[in-house]
């Protein structure tokens, strides 16, 4: 099937089939975008009733780090495209699936392997591409970890080589922080337990996500790199709590950001959305991380852009034209669960939606935790500052409560 020139009808022999590996809130939005284009979507996650499961044509629950289980589900469903939405996947199995011609992996199996942990992508960015990064060292024992901190110096940031949403991440400021940071990283890592990255602290003015799309240029039929306007964000313990678009920045810094994003995404190859995280201080820019998929800070694009990052991803992977233009200043603010319970309810929705320019996305996660992201408030405004104030006001109005 020549995807992009021809799309089929779901649940029929002509169907264009896409399998998402990871069906959280970001995957859910990708599924909705794909279904609007008539794509048949299969959602896979490690737990039942995940947000994406609730909107997909079919849902499966497997351990995605189990190569045999992953291969079996692909052989059973026979998707045309496999779209990883999380890091905790048996990427060697994806490479074998792609090599066997069973399905195309988005953006590529190699990109998925490189970005599944911080070591692969940091070595690509710093050592192969020569991009500016913070000083760093890797360690797989407490002794090596202590030596890495001595080499990098304090303060420094410690992260498991494989984790997401800030899990296992901490800042080491004094000797008293060293052992707790190691223990926290060991508890927070996914799959590759026992290995961490120690990063030197960068004194930055702000952080951005440069959403970067590799998609077909309809004028040339070749792959082209497109950029969204920069997304500013606030993170607490490595977890996004607020984002806005556009982030004001100098023309020099913007150009450097896009040069870095272009180099790293071109090296990864394939088609789709990439979230390139960068530190900015004045006109200086440092590469931090890249995800070969929509980014959580990019949830703001549901309000700010004509085509959200999820629609851009869907179009790009299907070989369709994209339009990353900004429509209006907008912001997002996270709604946390607030309590540990299954099947919670939300009060204050009416008040939240009464905020001018506001909208909500309640993700439908089956189980809440106090600091689990259960939804997000979105808001537009005449300025970024106005949008941020509205988004935070709407988020604060939503009150997760026990359904008992």
Curated annotation (Swiss-Prot):
Enzyme Commission number: 6.3.1.21
Annotated TM spans: none
Matches recorded under InterPro entries: ATP-grasp, ATP-grasp_carboxylate-amine, ATP_grasp_subdomain_1, PreATP-grasp_dom_sf, PurT, PurT/PurK_preATP-grasp, PurT_C, Rudment_hybrid_motif
Keywords: ATP-binding, Ligase, Magnesium, Metal-binding, Nucleotide-binding, Purine biosynthesis
Coiled-coil region(s): none
Enzyme class (EC, first level): ligase
Residues engaged in binding Mg(2+): 277, 289
GO cellular component: cytosol
Catalysed reactions, as listed in the record: N(1)-(5-phospho-beta-D-ribosyl)glycinamide + formate + ATP = N(2)-formyl-N(1)-(5-phospho-beta-D-ribosyl)glycinamide + ADP + phosphate + H(+)
Gene Ontology molecular-function annotations: ATP binding; magnesium ion binding; phosphoribosylglycinamide formyltransferase 2 activity; phosphoribosylglycinamide formyltransferase activity
UniProt-annotated binding residues for N(1)-(5-phospho-beta-D-ribosyl)glycinamide: 25-26, 85, 296, 365, 372-373
Pathway the protein takes part in: Purine metabolism; IMP biosynthesis via de novo pathway; N(2)-formyl-N(1)-(5-phospho-D-ribosyl)glycinamide from N(1)-(5-phospho-D-ribosyl)glycinamide (formate route): step 1/1
GO biological process per UniProt: 'de novo' IMP biosynthetic process
Positions annotated to bind ATP: 118, 159, 164-169, 199-202, 207
Domain ATP-grasp: 123-318
Similarity comment: Belongs to the PurK/PurT family.
PANTHER family to which the protein is assigned, alphabetical: FORMATE-DEPENDENT PHOSPHORIBOSYLGLYCINAMIDE FORMYLTRANSFERASE
NCBIfam families xrefs: PRK09288.1, purT
Subunit structure: Homodimer.
Function, as annotated: Involved in the de novo purine biosynthesis. Catalyzes the transfer of formate to 5-phospho-ribosyl-glycinamide (GAR), producing 5-phospho-ribosyl-N-formylglycinamide (FGAR). Formate is provided by PurU via hydrolysis of 10-formyl-tetrahydrofolate.
Protein name, UniProt field: Formate-dependent phosphoribosylglycinamide formyltransferase
Species, as recorded: Burkholderia lata (strain ATCC 17760 / DSM 23089 / LMG 22485 / NCIMB 9086 / R18194 / 383)
